Swiss-Prot record:
One of its GO terms (biological process) is immune response. Gene3D superfamilies: 1.20.1260.10. Its main location: cytoplasm. This is Ferritin heavy chain. It comes from Cricetulus griseus. Fe cation 1 binds at E33, E68, H71. Keywords: Cytoplasm, Cytoplasmic vesicle, Iron, Iron storage, Lysosome, Metal-binding, Oxidoreductase, Phosphoprotein. PANTHER family: FERRITIN, FERRITIN HEAVY CHAIN. Belongs to the ferritin family. The gene is FTH1. It comes from the Eukaryota. Oligomer of 24 subunits. There are two types of subunits: L (light) chain and H (heavy) chain. The major chain can be light or heavy, depending on the species and tissue type. The functional molecule forms a roughly spherical shell with a diameter of 12 nm and contains a central cavity into which the insoluble mineral iron core is deposited. Interacts with NCOA4; NCOA4 promotes targeting of the iron-binding ferritin complex to autolysosomes following starvation or iron depletion. GO terms for molecular function: ferric iron binding; ferrous iron binding; ferroxidase activity. The keyword Transport does not apply. Residues 16-165 form the Ferritin-like diiron domain.
Length: 186
């Protein structure tokens, strides 16, 4: 086998009704999901620091990081099942290393989830425009409802932290960490 044969992707024999634009959009979504995982991992590490010490914030964001990575892996599996090719891109560094407060991190997470949701809605529209019912069903089944739930949960967390006086009232984040995140399913 020549070097050229090893480096060029052969055409898929399973590909059917899978537009190149959809394939490219899936690769972009994979990158976005991995970026979200990376951001949540950064948040988790911040809250696990000895000078921050909010262990349930750390656990919550670590769980979110794992979920986002699983989303990326699911999309990779879909890409292979549909006969597409996975082209991984560099994952952008999170915008910050210091998340300042639980409230700030939750607000950033809410913004991130809304961005991911918007990207999924655009992917769904593309699949609709390309008459790809398989991709539409996949996005509806595995992503859209979960995104709405995540956005609602994060919105509730932001509201409750604000009501408690965070971040000015330091005790608010400690109590939220202990009583809300300490008893959540995440």
């Amino acid at each position: 086998m020549t070097t050229t044969a090893l480096t060029t992707a052969s055409p898929s024999q399973v590909r059917q009704n899978y537009h190149q634009d959809s394939e490219a959009a899936i690769n972009r979504q994979i990158n976005l999901e991995l970026y979200a995982s990376y951001v949540y991992l950064s948040m988790s590490c911040y809250f696990d620091r000895d000078d921050v010490a909010l262990k349930n914030f750390a656990k919550y964001f670590l769980h979110q990081s794992h979920e986002e990575r699983e989303h990326a892996e699911k999309l990779m599996k879909l890409q292979n099942q549909r006969g597409g090719r996975i082209f991984l891109q560099d994952i952008k560094k999170p915008d910050r290393d210091d998340w300042e407060s639980g409230l700030n991190a939750m607000e950033c997470a809410l913004h991130l989830e809304k961005s991911v949701n918007q990207s999924l809605l655009e992917l769904h529209k593309l699949a609709t425009d390309k008459n790809d019912p398989h991709l539409c069903d996949f996005i509806e089944t595995h992503y859209l409802n979960e995104q709405v739930k995540s956005i609602k949960e994060l919105g509730d967390h932001v509201t409750n932290l604000r009501k408690m006086g965070a971040p000015e009232a330091g005790m608010a984040e400690y109590l939220f960490d202990k009583h809300t995140l300490g008893h959540s399913e995440s």
